[in-house]
């Protein structure tokens, strides 16, 4: 599946914030989830919303706070996708 440029950049930027020993599994799980989300919407391309949604679905709830801080620092607007709580 194709990824649009912003989605790929966001994915790589967030992934870079994840500890090295977890990065491999996070990369696999989040990429797979993002592609599933895009397919479920009958799209041929992963968009930034899919990436954000995938990170929230695949990241344990206890780590959402630090992940949100990382997204804020990167300028990724997760709140516009409904993840403001």
Can you say where each PLM-predicted feature lies in the sequence?
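Non-catalytic accessory segments flanking P-loop/AAA+ NTPase cores
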Residues: 1-85
């Amino acid at each position: 599946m194709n990824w649009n440029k912003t989605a790929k950049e966001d994915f790589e930027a967030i992934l870079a914030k994840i500890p090295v020993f977890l990065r491999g599994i996070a990369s696999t799980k989040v990429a797979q989830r993002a592609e599933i989300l895009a397919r479920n919407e009958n799209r041929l391309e992963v968009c930034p919303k899919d990436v954000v949604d995938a990170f929230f679905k695949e990241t344990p709830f206890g780590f959402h706070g630090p992940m949100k801080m990382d997204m804020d620092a990167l300028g990724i607007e997760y709140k516009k996708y409904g993840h403001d709580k």
